[in-house]
């Protein structure tokens, strides 16, 4: 690292350049160019190597951030990748999709006055470069225990659990209903944030480590939980939350109203060459006036996907102001650049339809910000007499997700909470063990919809809980 302790003044924070707007608006490719070697080294050199690094504390997997920044600055890429993988199963993914402004970079000592270290982009650089140079996890010292665990769900929680188990000699077999690993990483997050080759490469790496994947395999249809409990020493549930939350709006089942997740999944499958399904039909927004209801990152994915499909006009409508919007500021900025219109402080009352029963608009009412709610965000209070119509040919509802019905789980004494989430306490003797001692769970199905990195953290901790229970 530099001997100049004021290097953060001499060298300002630099983000990687974005692809030109004319390309971004029509192609499903990652919009950020990767750092060059020189850029990565220089930006890593801005790190102060704080004695108590808040960036590590804020990261859900507690990455050794200053340490691998130092290695990156010195060009020791293999060592940096090795250290990165000690705490994170998917560092090249987190470097792309984590909301660093709310996590590591938001906690960087330099953030307020000098601009945070570009931690996420360096994390991406380290691991992409290491893979390109041939680095792979060293499994030569792993001793097999003879134990095997079935993992249901190849999303971030399931993959993280499989990773840790495999590195400790426990055979992991991962079942997933989709034709590729990743869960919502692959099929929910659009390619302009995470190109799908990233997860294809990951499957090859995991397979080389000894993880076995059984794709296009749905529990309850193609394989039964009874059989998994009989054939394996433990089962981990990393099934996520896929059921879209409804808005309770008049005419929300009208022709032209779509749920966010099926819309995104079908678009990605179409781009990857996979067929559509009855539950997830491909929908094109070409030439349409699109209104997306919601203010989270899923809403941002929907508006930006609609732009790339050729929508005539795209609007994001959110009931609070921009300051209280849950979506990443980076994603909001990108959407604005790509031509999305934002309407804040508007709440939907119902869907307007024409004589043929098709969407013609959204009935809205204006709101103003009131006192904070239980989560600390200011309430949206309706302004009387402010009803109005926003014209639309298509409406996408991005109100969040809840657990889907798992009939195959009911008879196995796995307790659920009032919202349908699996109860699997992190603080139990065996972390993330359910009321059925042979079944563990983690990620969104336990805590509700959350970040990719949080699911990774829970999957890794659940693996420790499984190994503790198996006494390996």
UniProtKB/Swiss-Prot annotation:
Binds 1 [4Fe-4S] cluster. Glutamine binds to the large subunit and transfers the amido group to 2-oxoglutarate that apparently binds to the small subunit. Aggregate of 4 catalytic active heterodimers, consisting of a large and a small subunit. The gene is gltD. Residues 38-69 form the 4Fe-4S ferredoxin-type domain. Gene3D superfamilies: Alpha-helical ferredoxin, FAD/NAD(P)-binding domain. Its EC number is 1.4.1.13. Pathway: Amino-acid biosynthesis; L-glutamate biosynthesis via GLT pathway; L-glutamate from 2-oxoglutarate and L-glutamine (NADP(+) route): step 1/1; Energy metabolism; nitrogen metabolism. Keywords: 4Fe-4S, Amino-acid biosynthesis, Glutamate biosynthesis, Iron, Iron-sulfur, Metal-binding, NADP, Oxidoreductase. This is Glutamate synthase [NADPH] small chain. Catalyzes the conversion of L-glutamine and 2-oxoglutarate into two molecules of L-glutamate. Optimum pH is 7.6. NCBIfam families: gltD_gamma_fam. [4Fe-4S] cluster binds at residues 47, 50, 55, 59. The lineage of its organism: Bacteria, Pseudomonadati, Pseudomonadota, Gammaproteobacteria, Enterobacterales. It comes from Escherichia coli (strain K12). InterPro entries: 4Fe4S_Fe-S-bd, DPD_II, FAD/NAD-bd_sf, FAD/NAD-binding_dom, GltD-like, Helical_ferredxn. GO terms for cellular component: cytosol; glutamate synthase complex (NADPH). It catalyses: 2 L-glutamate + NADP(+) = L-glutamine + 2-oxoglutarate + NADPH + H(+). GO terms for biological process: ammonia assimilation cycle; glutamate biosynthetic process; L-glutamate biosynthetic process. It is an enzyme of class 1 (oxidoreductase). Its cofactor is [4Fe-4S] cluster.
């Amino acid at each position: 690292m530099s001997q100049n302790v004021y290097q953060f003044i001499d060298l300002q924070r630099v983000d990687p350049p974005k692809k030109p707007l004319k390309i971004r608006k029509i192609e499903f490719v990652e919009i950020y160019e990767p750092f060059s070697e020189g850029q990565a080294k220089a930006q890593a050199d801005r790190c102060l190597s704080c004695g108590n690094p808040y960036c590590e504390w804020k990261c859900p997997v507690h990455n050794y951030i200053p340490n691998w920044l130092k290695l990156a600055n010195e060009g020791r890429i293999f060592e940096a990748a090795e250290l990165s993988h000690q705490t994170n199963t998917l560092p090249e993914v987190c470097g792309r999709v984590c909301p660093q402004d709310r996590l590591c970079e938001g906690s960087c000592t330099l953030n307020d006055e000098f601009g945070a270290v570009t931690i996420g982009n360096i994390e991406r650089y380290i691991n992409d470069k290491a893979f390109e140079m041939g680095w792979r996890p060293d499994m030569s010292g792993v001793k097999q225990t003879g134990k095997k665990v079935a993992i249901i769900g190849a999303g971030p929680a399931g993959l993280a659990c499989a990773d840790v188990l495999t590195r400790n000699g426990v055979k992991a077999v991962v079942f997933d209903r989709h034709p590729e690993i990743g869960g919502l990483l692959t099929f929910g997050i659009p390619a302009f944030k995470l190109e799908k080759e990233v997860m294809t490469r990951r499957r090859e790496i995991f397979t080389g480590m000894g993880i076995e994947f059984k794709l296009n395999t749905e529990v309850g249809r193609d394989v039964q939980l009874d059989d998994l409990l009989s054939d394996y020493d433990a089962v981990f549930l990393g099934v996520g939350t896929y059921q879209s939350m409804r808005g309770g709006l008049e005419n929300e089942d009208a022709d032209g109203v779509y749920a966010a997740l099926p819309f995104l999944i079908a678009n990605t499958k179409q781009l990857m060459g996979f067929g559509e399904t009855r539950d997830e039909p491909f929908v094109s927004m070409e030439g349409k006036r699109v209104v997306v209801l919601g203010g989270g990152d899923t809403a941002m994915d929907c508006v930006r996907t609609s732009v790339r499909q050729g929508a005539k006009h795209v609007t994001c409508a959110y009931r609070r102001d921009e300051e209280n919007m849950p979506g990443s500021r980076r994603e909001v900025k990108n959407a604005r650049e790509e031509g999305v219109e934002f309407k804040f402080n508007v709440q939907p009352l119902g869907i307007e339809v024409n004589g043929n029963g098709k969407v013609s608009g959204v009935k809205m009412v204006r709101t103003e910000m009131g006192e904070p709610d239980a989560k600390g965000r200011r309430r949206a209070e309706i302004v009387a007499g402010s009803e109005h119509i926003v014209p639309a040919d298509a409406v996408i509802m991005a109100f969040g997700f809840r657990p889907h019905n798992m009939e195959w789980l009911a008879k196995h004494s796995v307790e659920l909470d009032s919202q349908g989430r699996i109860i699997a306490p992190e603080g139990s003797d065996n972390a993330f063990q359910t009321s059925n001692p042979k079944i563990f769970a983690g990620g969104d199905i336990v805590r509700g919809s959350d970040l990719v990195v949080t699911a990774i953290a829970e999957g890794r901790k659940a693996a420790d809980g499984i190994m503790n229970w198996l006494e390996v």
